Amino acid sequence: MSKIVKRKEKKANDELTSLAEKIRAKALENQKKLIEAEKEGGSESDSEEDATAEKKKVLKSKSKSTVSTQNENTNEDESFESFSELNLVPELIQACKNLNYSKPTPIQSKAIPPALEGHDIIGLAQTGSGKTAAFAIPILNRLWHDQEPYYACILAPTRELAQQIKETFDSLGSLMGVRSTCIVGGMNMMDQARDLMRKPHIIIATPGRLMDHLENTKGFSLRKLKFLVMDEADRLLDMEFGPVLDRILKIIPTQERTTYLFSATMTSKIDKLQRASLTNPVKCAVSNKYQTVDTLVQTLMVVPGGLKNTYLIYLLNEFIGKTMIIFTRTKANAERLSGLCNLLEFSATALHGDLNQNQRMGSLDLFKAGKRSILVATDVAARGLDIPSVDIVVNYDIPVDSKSYIHRVGRTARAGRSGKSISLVSQYDLELILRIEEVLGKKLPKESVDKNIILTLRDSVDKANGEVVMEMNRRNKEKIARGKGRRGRMMTRENMDMGER
């Protein structure tokens, strides 16, 4: 019997190897086609770029967003061609050049001038618009003249976003000697307390962990805080941080404090929050409704029942060499699809809520460094993550609300770049996709599919998926067994302690 099992295993492995070889062959063929297409189009590129630039100017003049204001405050609806026009300190201008910030984005053009004048700001802009630099630049410009500890505090809804905001401050403040620290849940409180005792200029934090330190870390206070920023404020409130925000606002000073509130949307909750925390703010709106950028191509792919895995592998093969985020609805699916991709020799890493903070940052670092071309994620990655070079977003599972769809596809086509999103739509997703199309105000075109390739891939992909599921089940059983063992040891120790009494 064991020989029969081994022969079956060998046959299955051979089939998987064969599939991987076929995929690689197809990938090479696709890459050759891309290279040939680029060569043919090379002579036309200059004229195309000129035409594109002219087209962008026309579109810009037609679609300038109106800038509404709170309490009649206003800022001019103008754009700037360089950061030097904003009258920043030389160190900041040079840092922008070092980061290849060619010119301020619309939200930066609208928000930075009134912020430099000392106004409170409400910034409303779609994802990928450069919101972080829009509040970091005026804070750092003022910090250059003051250089005080605990100068600014930025509140973010997730640990990943907080870490990325810190990276932006560190990069922009690299020539200014700026000290920053990231205070988030899931990390050691004592290590964070030591970082706070070093008196950083900038604190980036999730609300709950900041409140922990305000209440429990001796010597830490924000009584002299000059700037408070609430980034992704709509998300902060969606995640039930409202009561914690109220407590924080009561602790920190209101006199001589400048407050910025940035959000993708303006809701009644946001309006209530800004009334409680801001004074005569200037409202800078680039977009006042759910929408996607013009450089994003959005399509859907109708998937017959039971073939979603095969269609996904088909897409990975068609877009070989591109960076991709695959969004799923569950943590188990994220882990399973990551394993399936890797088994079929597509380099992937997973990002979901079952990973600890170090594992999450490790996955992100692998993806951002180009060591993995595919990130399989739940919606934990959909908001705030600044990964500039994502070519394609795939919705393996359609999100249940339209706002999540907007935030997912906003991971590509960021800061003027082009990008593509593809949604895998089954018969059960029709109502969800109709709602999304209603919000977008347009029908999503269908992606073409080579059905012959789908049929060729189907059996092998199903077998590979079966292997991944078996491996996940095996790991889960081991995890449960380890848990039982620990509980048994704890109960034994408790019984011993009771006997000693």
UniProtKB/Swiss-Prot annotation:
Q: What happens when the gene is disrupted?
A: Leads to improper processing of 35S precursor rRNA.
Question: Is-annotated flag, keyword RNA-binding?
Answer: yes
* Record's keyword terms, sorted: ATP-binding, Coiled coil, Helicase, Hydrolase, Nucleotide-binding, Nucleus, Phosphoprotein, Ribosome biogenesis, RNA-binding, rRNA processing
Compositional bias annotation for Basic and acidic residues: 491-501
E.C. number: 3.6.4.13
- Ranges where the Helicase C-terminal domain occurs: 307-461
Residue ranges of every copy of the Helicase ATP-binding domain listed in the record: 112-284
Keyword Ligase assigned: no
UniProt cross-references to InterPro entries, sorted A to Z: DDX47/Rrp3_DEADc (IPR044765), DEAD/DEAH_box_helicase_dom (IPR011545), DEAD_box_RNA_helicase (IPR050079), Helicase_ATP-bd (IPR014001), Helicase_C-like (IPR001650), P-loop_NTPase (IPR027417), RNA-helicase_DEAD-box_CS (IPR000629), RNA_helicase_DEAD_Q_motif (IPR014014)
Record GO biological process: maturation of SSU-rRNA; maturation of SSU-rRNA from tricistronic rRNA transcript (SSU-rRNA, 5.8S rRNA, LSU-rRNA); rRNA processing
Report residue spans for region: Disordered: 36-79, 480-501
Subcellular locations according to the entry: Nucleus
Taken from the UniProt entry, a GO cellular component term is: nucleoplasm
PTM Phosphoserine: at which residues? 43, 45, 47
Q: Locate the motif DEAD box.
A: 231-234
Cite the pH-dependence comment. Answer: Optimum pH is 7.0-9.0.
Q: What is the predominant subcellular site recorded for this chain? A: nucleus
A molecular function (GO) held by this record is:
ATP-dependent activity, acting on RNA
State where ATP binds.
Answer: 125-132
Q: What domain of life is recorded for the organism?
A: Eukaryota
Coiled coil ranges (UniProt) are 3-44
The UniProt activity regulation field reads: ATPase activity is stimulated upon the addition of RNA.
Q: Which family does it belong to?
A: Belongs to the DEAD box helicase family. DDX47/RRP3 subfamily.
- Assembly description: Interacts with the SSU processome.
Q: What is known of its domains?
A: The Q motif is unique to and characteristic of the DEAD box family of RNA helicases and controls ATP binding and hydrolysis.
Q: What is this protein called?
A: ATP-dependent rRNA helicase RRP3
Q: What are the top taxonomic ranks of the organism?
A: Eukaryota, Fungi, Dikarya, Ascomycota, Saccharomycotina
Q: Which gene encodes it?
A: RRP3
